[in-house]
């Protein structure tokens, strides 16, 4: 792929990280192969995860093609930029096309990024995973490399105001690769979830204590924080989903009434 947009965007992003005085802590990046198809599976706690997530493959000289929801590609400015970076558009109502695109990218030796939770976790811990990550990797015959992001949620996430205060730590922890066969996607997905859950616990405990006091809203309730529990987060997600459906129905009715 001929990358014209991606490299300068990376340079710009790194400059922004420096302006913000951020401390980027990378661990385990040797697990990202320098060549060949690889699927990177990320946890999802922030709207900025895909920006920072690519850093996991940076030491290996790789560019990550992220699978992202269609709405981002529908944006007048964001859409063309995303396409120029060869990211993969995902229609949550019809995911067959994105599945095949991801498999094609991987078989051509690309690094593809995916969020198995599909949406941001309000609980700050792992929600239930979709099986797509393991099915895609198995179909392409490539490894899945788990990656845990931590600290991005402090800047921009659901239900909280944006906060780009200086001097914060952002950590990315890369785990050893998994090699799905596709024989049992549910079991293989459960293995990925368990591996990443343990990595998340380790990432939270390794985060600087002075930046993460007890009761912090960005820390899971199960780890001493005040984020919603998984059950509370699921309820909020359900309410949000119903509200979006209501607004879509209203918009459809309005368009029909205008005809």
Where in the sequence are the language-model features?
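A transmembrane-helix-recognition feature enriched in membrane-embedded lipid enzymes
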Residues: 1-28, 75-85
